[in-house]
Amino acid sequence: DSKMKEINDLKDKKLGTISIGDSETQNKALTDIEKDLGSKPVTISYSSYKKYGDDLYNGNVDAILVNEGSRGMFEEEHSDFNKKTRVIKEYRYETKSKALAKGVDVTEDPFNVYITGIDTYGTISTVSRSDVNMIATVNPKTHQILLTSIPRDYYVPQPCQGGQTDKLTHTGIFGVDCTVETVENYFGIDINYYVRVNFSSVENIVNALGGITVNNPVAFTASDGTYSYEAGDVYMDGSKALRFARERYNLGGGDRDRGKNQMRVITGIINKAISPSIITNYTSILDAVSGSFQTNMSNNEMTSLIKMQINDMSGWDIEQISVNGTGNASAWSPANGFNSWVMEPNVNTVKRAVEVMKKVENGEDVKALAQQVMEENTADE
C-alpha cells in the first residue's frame, strides 16, 4: 500500500538506515540518493534488523536502505519481507577483494583452500551470508585432501566487526576477505586460496560435470518434498545435489549433518572432476563453469594442478572431519542486533582439526585419524 514507487517519491520522506554492517557501501548509496533527490534524505538510524523491518511495516519510516547481502537477515524476523516490500531504486557498487593469496607451488607444496558458499542464486558477485564454510587442506605430493567443515553458526571473533563475536555465516555480508581472515585468526592457520560459490554455482558445476555420485549414509527425503535420497551411492544432477547439500531439517544432526553432506558433495565433485573423461577435457569444462565461482587462485596455478593430474592420473584420498560445539539460544549477534541461536565452539575439536591438517601438510596418512576424529565429534553431539 506504500506510495513509494520510485526514488523521487522519497523526497522529504523518512529513510531508514542501519548502523550494522558495511557502512562504506551504505554511505556511497546515501550520496547517490542525495544526488537523485537534489537534497539530503531524512534518515533514521537503526541498530537492529528486527526494529528496522518493524518500523517499515508500521509506517514509522517510508523506506529503508537494504544491502542485498543482508536481505536474509530481514527474513529471519519477517518471513514475508520479500512479498511485502518492493525495490524502488537499486545502486550497484564493486569492491576489490584484498590480496589474500599466500601463493605456493601448487604441484609441490601443501596448501589450504577456503570453500565458502553464499545463500543466494544468480550472479556470484552478490554479497551474502556464508552458509557453507569448509577448509580443504591439499597435499599434491601425497595426493591427500582433508575437508574440514565449520558450522555456519560458529560463534567466533570477527575482525570486520571490530573483533566482536558473532556467527561465522555473518562474515559473508562483509565479503570473503572477512570470512577468510576470521577463520585464519580463529584456527591459527594460513589460508592460501579461497573458492566462493552460490546456489547457482553448485547446479552449474555439477551439471557441467555430467552429474556426480555421492555416498549417502542415511536415507531421507528433503523437507520440501522435492527429492528422496536412498542410502548408498546416489547419482545426482545439479538440482538434486544442491538440495542434498542444503537440507538440514530432516537430518538427525541438523546443521552438523548438513555440513557432512556438503563435504560429501564436494568429494563427489572432486572425484568426477579428476576422472579421465573429464580432466582430459578440462578446457571445455572450465569454459562451461566460467563465471560460476570466484577464486584468487590464478589460471596458471589451476592449469598447473590440472596438468599434474593429467600426467599422473593417480587417485586422491579425500578425508572428512568437522569441528563441533554447543548450542546457545540467546547469544548476542552484532550483525542481527538481537540475541540469536549460535554454536559455542568446542575448542578441543578445533585443536584436533588443526592437528589433522598439519599431519596432511607433513605428508602423513590421516585416514584412520580422520575417522577417529569424526567418531569423537559424533559422540559429543
Spans of features found by a protein language model:
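Gram-positive cell-envelope targeting signals
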Residues: D1-M4
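Non-catalytic, solvent-exposed segments at the cell envelope interface
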Residues: E6-I7, K11, G16-G21, N27, ...
